[in-house]
Curated annotation (Swiss-Prot):
Residues 258-347 are annotated as: Head domain (RuvB-H). This is Holliday junction branch migration complex subunit RuvB. GO terms for molecular function: ATP binding; ATP hydrolysis activity; four-way junction DNA binding; four-way junction helicase activity. Residues 1-185 are annotated as: Large ATPase domain (RuvB-L). ATP binds at residues 24-25, 66, 69-71, 132-134, 175, 185, 222. Keywords: ATP-binding, Cytoplasm, DNA damage, DNA recombination, DNA repair, DNA-binding, Hydrolase, Nucleotide-binding. DNA binds at residues 313, 318. It comes from Leifsonia xyli subsp. xyli (strain CTCB07). Its main location: cytoplasm. Homohexamer. Forms an RuvA(8)-RuvB(12)-Holliday junction (HJ) complex. HJ DNA is sandwiched between 2 RuvA tetramers; dsDNA enters through RuvA and exits via RuvB. An RuvB hexamer assembles on each DNA strand where it exits the tetramer. Each RuvB hexamer is contacted by two RuvA subunits (via domain III) on 2 adjacent RuvB subunits; this complex drives branch migration. In the full resolvosome a probable DNA-RuvA(4)-RuvB(12)-RuvC(2) complex forms which resolves the HJ. CDD domains: AAA. Gene3D superfamilies: 1.10.8.60, P-loop containing nucleotide triphosphate hydrolases, Winged helix-like DNA-binding domain superfamily/Winged helix DNA-binding domain. Residues 186-255 are annotated as: Small ATPAse domain (RuvB-S). The RuvA-RuvB-RuvC complex processes Holliday junction (HJ) DNA during genetic recombination and DNA repair, while the RuvA-RuvB complex plays an important role in the rescue of blocked DNA replication forks via replication fork reversal (RFR). RuvA specifically binds to HJ cruciform DNA, conferring on it an open structure. The RuvB hexamer acts as an ATP-dependent pump, pulling dsDNA into and through the RuvAB complex. RuvB forms 2 homohexamers on either side of HJ DNA bound by 1 or 2 RuvA tetramers; 4 subunits per hexamer contact DNA at a time.
Amino acid sequence: MSDDPTTPELESESESELAFEGALRPRTLAEFVGQAKVRGQLQLLLTAARMQERTADHILLAGPPGLGKTTLAMIVAHESDRPLRLSSGPAIQHAGDLAALLSSLTPGEVLFIDEIHRMARTAEEMLYLAMEDFRIDIMVGKGAGATSIPLDLAPFTLVGATTRSGLLPNPLRDRFGFTAHLEFYDEGELAQVLARAAVMLEFEIDGEALAEIAGRCRGTPRIANRLLRRVRDYALVHGGRADIAAVHAALELYDVNELGLDRLDRAVLHAILERFEGGPVGLNTLAVSVGEEPETIESVVEPFLVRIGLLSRTPRGRVATVAAWRHFGLAAPRQGHSQPPSLMDDL
């Protein structure tokens, strides 16, 4: 992890992938595809702030990875005509990290903190006062002789992003003037995202092929753009057309099936079906069985599997649905494997 609190964690993304995604990012709300309600709400918030010549209210963006939280933060800065400062929760592990970051902001600057729920508790508590009154208290000295010195801050707009809004303490959540939950995209919206990306990349691909990619990208624009890149590479190397046959061949090569399931999705489902006889199984046990972090399974894999009806989350643990058994051509046991989904999680 970087010692610089302004450097976001990007452990799972290569520099080339980041450059590719950055080139495709929309710069305005008008260019942003999907999330129509959120776009309308943000447009109103930003327009009102400009008309009143003030900084925009603090904004919290929640939702699964890859739906556009970072892009929307960049758009907020661009449409506010203000600079953007990037940071992340894991990079802010001490109150001093946050104090240094906040005290260096210029008037009206937009501060984006990704994965804000992973920020240290001492930093969270300092952020309360900063968001509300644009000041922080700096402790000087130790023990009984310690004194608090107030430090005024330049007015700023905080944009926080989280994949797990339930982990945010209520005092922090309540200080955001606007909160939005980003939803998964439908196939029509994803086809628009892909068509825009293809034009920007000067990549000729037919509509049927785009629709096929849209159906396999888990409702997530980031995945859609990455799959488009894989199809483009395949067409380039094999010297053929970027048609539906090329899509099938490329995605089969990269283990993305017709539902959009990838290697990890299938590993999770196979573990539940075969090792645990359909479940229920706890999150930590499941994570160990597939060699993955529990947080990755909970925030990346499960939302998609639950949404397409292959997995249920119950008070006792994760359970494979009848549809999951059928998808893999297996006969479901008679009892206990078709419980309705639950928002409750196991410990």
